[in-house]
């Protein structure tokens, strides 16, 4: 009711927003798990198609059995060059997936003829969808979270050096470019502010991401120690605010599941 009162056209047409009453629609569809899919395609291409390390049937059996008693095979599939560093086959697949998905969304209007805007945004549902998804060819186990937004999975860059820059470039590369957003999730340790040139490097990173075509940055600047303390006793840190995904919230106001999701992501990024 409130939405209808503040929109042009609903009163004049006597139609609800959902029934075609407004003049302009901004309808979006968001894709999930870009890195999970891109890394899976790259793993299949390298280990099965090019190297013949296993057959299609063997892979199907491993996925059905959730890599049971096959940790060496799971790690083999996981250890391919992943989405994020630049120039990998997984980078190729991520871009191809983004383009194919965007073209499909743009060419498929709603039943009422409205065009949709594609984006790659998980909205904090990586645990929810991951819990329903069986094992995947990139070495992910059944029930594990899917990848966040269009960000590379944690650990995508061997050694970890330069990860924020590489991640920024990767996310900018796969933007659907139709107005909907594909956020870059950055979780930085607060100690960066006390290092020489630390703040300037963050400023440069933000500017570079925008110049490459990035549309949104979700940024956390927090120490691991403070985060873990707040997770153990949220009420002892009532003023701690975190960027969950497309929104910020007091950490203590989040459910235990959401708090754990934020903790897991930040700890993985800083590992």
What kind of region is each of these model predictions?
Residues 1-271:
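Acidic, glycine-enriched catalytic cores built around paired aspartates
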């Amino acid at each position: 009711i409130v939405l209808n009162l503040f929109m042009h056209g609903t009163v004049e047409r006597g139609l609800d927003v959902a029934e075609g009453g407004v003049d302009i629609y901004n309808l979006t569809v968001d894709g999930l798990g870009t890195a999970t899919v891109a890394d899976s395609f790259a793993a299949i291409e390298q280990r099965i198609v090019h190297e013949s390390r296993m057959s299609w049937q063997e892979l199907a059996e491993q996925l059905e059995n959730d890599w049971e008693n096959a940790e060496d095979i799971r790690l083999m599939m996981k250890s391919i060059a992943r989405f994020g560093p630049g120039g990998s086959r997984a980078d190729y697949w991520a871009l191809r997936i983004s383009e194919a998905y965007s073209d499909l969304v743009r060419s498929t209007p709603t039943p009422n003829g409205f065009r949709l805007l594609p984006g790659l945004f998980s909205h904090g549902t990586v645990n929810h969808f991951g819990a329903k998804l069986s094992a995947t060819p990139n070495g992910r186990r059944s029930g594990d979270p899917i990848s966040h937004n269009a960000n590379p999975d944690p650990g995508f860059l061997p050694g970890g050096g330069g990860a924020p820059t590489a991640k920024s470039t990767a996310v900018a590369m796969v933007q659907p470019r139709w107005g909907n957003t594909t956020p870059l999730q950055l979780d930085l340790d607060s100690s960066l502010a006390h290092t020489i040139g630390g703040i300037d490097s963050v400023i440069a990173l933000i500017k570079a991401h925008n110049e490459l075509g990035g549309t949104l940055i979700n940024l956390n600047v927090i120490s691991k120690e403070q985060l873990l303390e707040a997770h153990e006793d949220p009420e002892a840190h009532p003023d701690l605010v975190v960027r969950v995904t497309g929104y910020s919230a007091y950490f203590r106001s989040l459910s235990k599941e959401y708090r754990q999701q934020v903790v897991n992501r930040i700890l993985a990024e800083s590992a």
